[in-house]
Amino acid sequence: NKLYTCKIAEANTIWITQVDPNFYQVNEPSRFYQLLEYGLYFTNQTRMTTQEINPRWGQTFSAGYTHSPLEHIDLGYQWWGDGHLYFPGFTTNHSLSLYGGFQHMSDKERNYSNKILYPRGITLPGYEIASLRTGYHMPIAFPDLPLSSLLYLKTINAAVFYDWGSSRNKFGKATYSSYGIELTTDTHFFRLTYPIRLGIRTGYETQHKKMFADLIFSIGLSI
């Protein structure tokens, strides 16, 4: 790559000349950084039956800290904490779930990767983010139906949710919310023991004041 400099003469004449690289030094920032991350994790829950979507009682908490002591430039630091709480619903196999998360980044210009869950349907850019997610989950049917040797349909579930989020950046603070419904099914493919959850989520979010729809996909890899 060649560097050029622009010179302006008195008579509004402009000309461009090539720069001799021997007299200039160009420093490009590294695209890869070495980070150190520390964390704590705690979980406690009741044993689940095959028909339950979530544990009747459960608590999961995590917290962490990330910084860059090995870099020659100061990338700042990040800390976060979040937790899940599960409670019994109004009837058998129903479940109420609560989630709360908070993260803070010291550098207001450069963001680390996100560590907490956003409100559904919303993206929260900023150096300080808070999130609250609530959901009520219920099974609709238990078909236990093998559709072929490749697919086994286990359960069909539904959920309603309401989420809230707050984001602070260099321009100020903003809060948003979303609400909607989810429809999912728990399946097994190729006779594998690991359950796969497929579904769709639709709702309304106040960030852009419009409806949204997401696909849901998760794999249970518990040992």
Predicted segments with their positions:
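Extracellular/periplasmic, surface-exposed regions of secreted and cell-surface proteins
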Residues: 5-7, 159, 206-210
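Outer-membrane beta-barrel transmembrane domain signature
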Residues: 93, 136, 155-189, 198
